Amino acid sequence: MQTLRCPACIGRLQPSRESGSQTRLVCRECGEEFPVIRSIPRLLLSPFREALLGNGTAAGTDAQQLETALSFGFEWTRFPEMYDEWGRSFLEYMQPHTAEFFRGKKVLDAGCGNGRFAFYAAKHGAEVWAIDLGPAVEVAQRNTATAGKVQVVQADLHKPPFAPDSFDFIYSIGVLHHLPDPEAAFQNLLRYLKPGGEIQIYLYWKPEAQPVKRALLTLVTAARKITTRLPHGINYLLAFPAAVLAFIFFVWPYRIMSRIPALNAIAQKLPMKQYSVFPFRVCVNDQLDRFSAPIENRYTRREVEAWLSRAGLNDIRVAACYGWIGNARKAG
């Protein structure tokens, strides 16, 4: 209760349970009540509370954000698997940090998906608070059950239910670019970062000097105008042939060419080569992600650097990693 706060007013919460009913968290300041369902606090405000926990709807940008959350909830319930390869992937996305960095730190996973990164952050010794807006929290709860100190919370990234200055480290990997106003959501997260703490983000890149990747992205963007309007189940079926094509044209050629010294330099330029070290279903999962998420924003290195600079952060670093990894430190 020291960390969790009311998302409406940042007031302190206290548990309340009447005989025979579920536990609820009640705000001492404004009186808002939030259910705890299957050990997950559901700290949602309207319209997401009604839409995700009841039978309500949302409109405008809220509707876009809701559909995005439901799309990813569908995705992670279809692809709940945890792979050993995620451990290497976790550290790749956390560069320049190593596993030792996480020991003893209080960490926020802002957009936890199926919980794969929260799992490894906890395994490396962190106390992790993992939030997501949609039904993916159920998968994350199961996947992190044996990881250590992980608390999954269902909440809106625009209104995180935490006390200010709560976390030593905040990361948001592959999430912000799916929001209606990504930079505003990013800046909002800084309120919950301790002075001197670090924030780490991963954003899709906008290819500038890579003609093959730029051409592929043009095709994907054109296809998304259709696929984002399709039912989730249809996109799930389409993700399989899309992954097969990726393996035929890029992954398998990379595996062969990278073993031939004379062709290795060409192999390293192939798109989608990262799937060569993952099971096929990971590629299918990512194709579903690519074609079904309603909102997708992409950025250049300079744009990511500008985000971090406008936020008044120090020690700014931006590195390429199948996109852009941005890391910076809050003053203090």
Which role fits each region the language model picked out?
Residues 169-180:
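A short SAM/SAH-binding and catalytic strip from SAM-dependent methyltransferases
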Residues 161-163, 180:
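GHKL-family ATP-binding catalytic core of two-component histidine kinases
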Residues 1-161, 169, 295-298, 303, ...:
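Conserved N-terminal segment of class I S-adenosyl-L-methionine
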Residues 214, 226-297, 301-309:
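Substrate-binding/catalytic lobe of Class I Rossmann-like enzymes that use SAM or dcSAM, i.e.
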Residues 198-229, 237-239:
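Conserved class I S-adenosyl-L-methionine
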